[in-house]
A protein has these predicted regions:
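Alpha-helical transmembrane segments of multi-pass membrane proteins
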Residues: 88, 120-134, 160-182, 207-215, ...
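Hydrophobic, membrane-inserted alpha-helices
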Residues: 13-16, 38-45, 126-131, 174-177, ...
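Hydrophobic transmembrane alpha-helices of Major Facilitator Superfamily
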Residues: 98, 414-417
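Membrane-core helix-loop-helix motifs of multi-pass transport proteins
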Residues: 153-237, 420-465
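Hydrophobic transmembrane alpha-helices of multi-pass small-molecule transporters
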Residues: 1-87, 211-341, 439, 443-465
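Alpha-helical transmembrane segments of integral membrane proteins, especially early/N-terminal helices
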Residues: 45-58, 98, 103-104, 178-193, ...
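Re-entrant/interfacial helical elements at transmembrane boundaries that shape
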Residues: 61, 108-109, 141-156, 171, ...
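Membrane-embedded alpha-helical segments and adjacent helix-loop junctions characteristic
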Residues: 25, 42, 55-161, 311-393
Length: 465
């Protein structure tokens, strides 16, 4: 509809003004809480309809709290001095170096040489390469943009027609390996840190790199094995004979020998991952490890000041920060306590039992994705809605972050998932049919719930469920 953004913006502002100045403050809620609630309503409308860039909406939301007297500046913007923000900045810097030097592409192509040059073999290769590379780059868009052209080259070499079974299957295999497995590793995407940052401090402490990985092992196994059989069942061509690996060999030859910059980047990232895994042993915060790693890469001229300015998605970093600020401010303004009383009848049955939670919550998130496009916005809305109930859950709120990050990845309809749109644009929208996308998404949604259910015994052994 023409002028949709303008209309949505006006509606959002009007609702915010009405809630702030004209609706009497309900019993049990302070005026500061009303201001935060009003800003949240306005911001969500702006985010859903993309009225202005998301990061600008977030900054205006935080500023409104200060201007209208809900909280002081130091409280509103406190999130930008936390370790979570700096691990995101450092992680994105490491990922930028891995992409710039060609290290990621080399690793992916090298892995593919070990598998048969047919549909089954290259599907498995894309799964394997993506899973290995996932924790190295904490941003979905570069991974999807890099992996789908590789899948297209393989598809062409195997003689698959655009939008056919084989082409669709390899496109989805690239996304499955490089994008879907992001939920398996804390460092694989900035949104993992965003959802973690909304949790209470105790729950955040439970979600270090090693614990996250262990918590997700059963889910990862289900997603990889189930995903492989799903894609081969749906998309394997009738004649799946191996062909020459010439395309992959040619791509590797074009890269030439491993450069000095690649070797330095590989070493720094491997050391960083080791320190992240052993964070509790070395007692060095993950953010410090990431910052030192990026500083070393800059000092050794792998990354330049210009790279640091242009290769990091600063608008995304700021947006994530403004989203994470909501958790602390909602508590400070008393909004979480009030919401807990209001929403208790509807929410309590869902969170009373962990098995009910891991079935019901993903379904709620799937439905939300039809309305809220942004992955981070969807996850934030769900997490904020549950914030008031964290204290009465029969399990650790850390599990909420896990469920949210696995469940926002829905792509039944093309508009639902921006990183997948990026991957599709990288191959000129020439590989997968809409039907193939919908089928694979439904398959993932089912496997996701199964994977989460299988995780519950592990979580119970870890004492968090």
């Amino acid at each position: 509809m023409k002028h949709k953004k303008l209309i949505a913006g006006i509606v959002g502002i009007v609702l915010g003004v009405i809630i702030t100045f004209f609706i009497p403050t309900p019993h049990g809620l302070t005026h500061a809480g009303m201001i935060v609630l009003a800003s949240l309503v306005t911001a969500n409308i702006f985010w859903i309809f993309n009225v202005i860039p998301s990061f600008a909406t977030g900054l205006l939301m935080l500023s409104s709290w200060v201007v209208l007297g809900a909280v002081k500046f130091e409280v509103a913007y406190q999130i930008f001095s936390t370790t979570t923000m700096w691990i995101i900045i450092g992680g994105l810097g490491l990922g930028a170096a891995a992409t710039k030097t060609g290290l990621i592409k080399r690793i992916a192509l090298k892995i593919m040489t070990f598998f048969p040059a047919n549909f089954r073999g290259q599907t498995l290769a894309l799964f394997t390469a993506g899973t290995i590379i996932a924790p190295m780059i904490p941003s979905a868009h570069p991974k999807t943009a890099m992996s789908t052209p590789i899948a297209k080259g393989i598809s062409n070499a195997l003689g698959y027609k655009p939008f056919g079974k084989g082409s669709s299957g390899l496109f989805l295999a690239a996304l499955w390996g490089f994008f879907v497995t992001e939920a398996s590793f804390l460092s694989a995407t900035a949104q993992n840190y965003a959802f973690k940052g909304l949790l209470p401090a105790k729950a955040q402490a439970q979600l270090n790199w090693g614990n996250w990985f262990i918590m997700m092992i059963p889910w990862t196994i289900i997603i990889l094995i189930g995903g492989y059989f799903l894609l081969t069942f749906l998309f394997k061509p009738k004649d799946d004979k191996p062909v020459s690996r010439e395309f992959i060999s040619k791509q590797l030859n074009e890269l030439g020998p491993m450069s000095r910059e690649e070797k330095i980047t590989a070493t720094v990232i491997l050391i960083a991952i080791v320190f992240w895994i052993l964070e509790s042993v070395f007692n060095i915060p993950a953010a410090i490890t990431a910052i030192i790693g990026v500083s070393v890469l800059v000092a050794l001229k792998v990354l330049t000041p210009e790279d640091f300015k242009t290769r990091l998605s600063w608008n995304t970093i700021i947006f994530i920060g403004t989203v994470m600020a909501l958790g602390n401010v909602m508590q400070s303004a008393g909004l979480t306590t009030w919401l807990r009383k209001i929403l208790a009848p509807a929410i309590s049955p869902i969170i009373d039992n962990i098995y009910i939670t891991v079935i019901a919550l993903p379904i709620i998130i799937y439905l939300c994705k039809f309305v809220v496009v942004s992955l981070i916005s969807t996850g934030t809305l769900i997490t904020i809605g549950l914030l008031p109930f964290f204290s009465q859950m029969s399990f650790s709120p850390a599990i909420i972050a896990i469920i949210v990050t696995t469940s926002v990845n829905v792509w039944i309809l093309s508009y639902m998932n921006a990183p997948i749109l990026t991957g599709s644009a990288a191959v000129q929208d020439s590989m997968a049919s809409r039907g193939a996308m919908a089928k694979s998404s439904i398959g993932y949604m089912i496997l996701n719930i199964i994977g989460l259910l299988v995780c519950v015994p592990i979580w119970q052994l870890m004492g968090i469920a």
